Amino acid sequence: MATITAAMVKELREITGVGMMDCKQALTENNGDMQAAIDWLRKKGLSKAAKKAGRVAAEGLIGVVTSGNKGVVVEVNSETDFVARNEQFQGLVKMVAQVALSVGADVEVIKAAEVGNATVATTISDAIATIGENMTLRRANSLEVPKGIVAGYVHNAVIDGAGKLGVIVALESAGNADELAALGRQVAMHIASANPVAVDPSGVDPEVVKREKDVLADKFRQQGKPEAMIEKITESGLKTFFKEQTLLEQPFIFDDKRSVGQALKEAEGRVGAPVRIAGFVRYALGEGIEKAESDFAAEVAAAAGQG
């Protein structure tokens, strides 16, 4: 039986908004498994949290650069937020993003790329020696469309193009570039705020859909719904899930009476051509890192080849 700590209970409460005692029971019943505890609470009708909010144990910056029909987003980690506010580190992040725009989003290719008389990897190593703290290029992603634009947005940017959360979104269209750019920035801001998991329902991981269906069906059974009705009301529940979790079906943050898909359709008149969301990437600093903060320096050192 796993030990249930106060920190685990606190985290589950922050994710789900459920009371402490229910959170402790959920963790106990599920042997400390956070995702299973979330699903257990949802089946009891106590929580609406649809997915695990990963614990963030990283510092650093997200960098975003776009140019016409392509764009990149990168994450460069440091050990402390103090370094993330350092001008040299901020310049490093912007340089890495610019290189990624030229050579693509493969981390190893970016590290091997030359800037001036040194590779990106060497430049990072030199910054480590100068600043006195480990740092690493953790990940990168890119988007490109044959016709259209890639728009970017950084939430609460500390400098132009770098902050704790960054988004790029590709709008495929033969329409007016200026109108597309304005529309793309709004959609990127929406993605930063609403955190969709996919462009539309077809892009949602089938395993996620299956788990959602199982949670909904179990919840309705516990509510005493007739078995003959469960499949129908589960499908209705899935429609709500997709409306909350997929970009085109979410209420648009700039006009919540319309979905993002409806807003795009209406914008086609201004753009002068059909508009399609070809894809998006949303990076929040440190997401997916679930180590204790005290272990993060070791992870950065290992990634940087320091140990």
Swiss-Prot record:
It holds the Pfam family EF_TS. Its main location: cytoplasm. The keyword Lyase does not apply. PROSITE patterns: EF_TS_1, EF_TS_2. GO terms for cellular component: cytoplasm. Keywords: Cytoplasm, Elongation factor, Protein biosynthesis. It is found in: Cytoplasm. GO terms for molecular function: translation elongation factor activity. Gene3D superfamilies: 1.10.286.20, DNA helicase RuvA subunit, C-terminal domain (1.10.8.10), Elongation factor Ts, dimerisation domain (3.30.479.20). Residues 80-83 are annotated as: Involved in Mg(2+) ion dislocation from EF-Tu. Associates with the EF-Tu.GDP complex and induces the exchange of GDP to GTP. It remains bound to the aminoacyl-tRNA.EF-Tu.GTP complex up to the GTP hydrolysis stage on the ribosome. Belongs to the EF-Ts family. This is Elongation factor Ts. The gene is tsf.
